[in-house]
Structures are given as structure tokens and as C-alpha cells.
Amino acid sequence: MSKRKTKSPEADVEDLFAIWDHDGELLCEHIIQGIDNFSSKQCIGTGGFGTLYKTEMPIGRVVAVKKLHSSEDGDMADLKAFKSEIHTLTHIRHRNIIEFYGFSSFVENSFLVYEFMEKGSLRNILSNDEEAEKLDWMVRLNVVKGVAKALSYMHHDCSPPIIHRDISSNNVLLDSEYEAHVSDFSTTRFLKSDSSNWTSMAGTFG
């Protein structure tokens, strides 16, 4: 079990990292038990690279856990996507980018741990008439601004610049205040400053 080295103003996050440093294997077991060994009852979503679960940590903090899909022989189906997400999220930090807490790279249970977004994905909200009504034009404008700020940070403030390559309503998550957070960095690319860069489309179409 590994963690992202970062400073957080929230004491509970610091406590989480302290537990991770002290006994990562024990914390890994707690996460697996917390989601009932990746039971479908704890599932809150699924994507091309993994299945998302919700669980509560020993300190009482609720987190989201993305378990990577496995191939028929039990190995991780897309190791490249797994490494890409870890590499990207350990190099960036922004209020409009999902916060990354850590990961497990055991063969049978490879997963990533993130902050939990109470409102879920923008796509799910827009697909629900009742929830969509809560998104007035000011809220929607703030969502767009949040995504734009995250992309501007990745493109202009990171060195080398980072290209997400799969911005969609499914990868924009909203917290309890409807603040936008960009997620899913499995297809990102770091641009080389000393050469021409050509980046193909990846991920969601539409």
C-alpha cells in the first residue's frame, strides 16, 4: 500500500496518512472489509478501467475506492492506465481536481483511493430530472468555471504540461456544494517541452 505525499489542512486526512504509514497492509484489509470484499451492494459506479465503491475509513472519513478490472487470468487488465493515474495524481494538486489519497497494487486487489464526492458525476445529475432542476444556470456556470480552472492549471501551471484527454460529464464529479472536480486520469499524457506533441483522442466519445 502506498500513499501520496502531500500536506492537507484537514487533520483527518493527516490521520489517514499516519495510519497508511504505520500499517498499510492493515489499512488495505480494512478497506476491503469496509466494502464487503468488493460487494456489488457497495458499488456506486463503473467505468472502462474499474469499478467504484464507497467506504468509511477507521477515522470516520468516507472515501471512494476504484478497483481496477481484472483479466480472465486474474492479472490487472490495464496496468498502463493504473500507473498513469497514480503518476499523474501524485504530481498535481488543485481544488478542482479530485484528491488522491493512496493505492494498493496487490495482484488480486489493485485499487485507488480518492476523496468522496457527495453529488456524484455531472452526467448522473443531468440524467435525473429532479436532480438536474437543482442545477440552475449560476451553478452550471460555476461547474464550467471549475473544470476550466482545472484544465488551465494542468496545461499552464504544471511542468511538463498535462493533457487529460477524456473530459466528459462522466469524469466531472460534484461535491456537496456542487463544486466541480475533474477525475479519471487513466489516459493522461505529459507533454515533452523539447519536441512536437501529437495527442490522439481517448476515452469517452460523444
Please tell me what each predicted stretch does.
Residues M1-G206:
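Conserved eukaryotic protein kinase-like
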